[in-house]
Amino acid sequence: MTIHRILKGFAPLAALAGAALLAGCDGMNIKIGDSEGVPLAELDMSGPAPTELVLAGPDRVIVTEGDELDITVSGDDGAIEALRFSLDDDSLGISRESDSWRDRGVATVRVTMPSLTAMVLAGSGDIEAASMSDEADVTIAGSGTAKVVRMDARSLDLTIAGSGDFEAAGSVGELDMTIAGSGRARMADLQVGNAEISVAGSGDAEFSSDGAVEANIMGSGTITVNGRADCTVSAMGSGKLNCREVRAADTGPEAPRAPDGPEAPEAPEA
């Protein structure tokens, strides 16, 4: 496995989010794209609806489908006051104002948009999306959790850098997955056509496939593939690729037919 397979995973975070995270004593200063964001009341949502989402912070975002962009917030007052929003090209950015990551509680942001094709999660927050489509792209950098209830995409490019978790169900034609660290991809209910997997560290992943699966594992990570996939692996360390053939449940032999009961004797003649 070449190192560029791991480094490429950080490209969506840089290109899509344009985020600079600078650690400080009192928290973190976040800038998404060319803007540090504005309160929700000041966000101009008159343009085209975004198709990409960036969350930088400890808050929770719930994404549902709808004809137009709509955003509502709830939760702890301090967290709500600290939220900052930005719209940059096709991306909606959600973060907090400088030095307000700690001791403010947690906010829940509900976003309605026509389509979600890419998301980036930086930090310890959570994203739950009803669906993703087309050429889906997911990047998790940190300890956050992202979930897609229904995936129906031609391809999925998934990167987990850190200890974050990803969960998905549905189907994708092609899966390109990179895990760098101890992250987990829990996708047992995701049917994949073909897959190319790279793991560096102790990360784990599970998905289903009947196609070609190629894995490169450096470390102690474990990849589990359910189905009838054609699997190949190159490993350095104790990492494993487990391809488990899953067939339809065996109905077993038919139960034996109960024997016929004895016939009743004829009645004697009078």
What do the PLM-derived regions correspond to, one by one?
Residues 2-12, 21-122, 126-139, 150-159, ...:
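Acidic (Asp/Glu) and glycine-rich low-complexity loops/linkers
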Residues 118-126, 137-145, 155-167, 174-186, ...:
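Tandem repeat domain/solenoid detector
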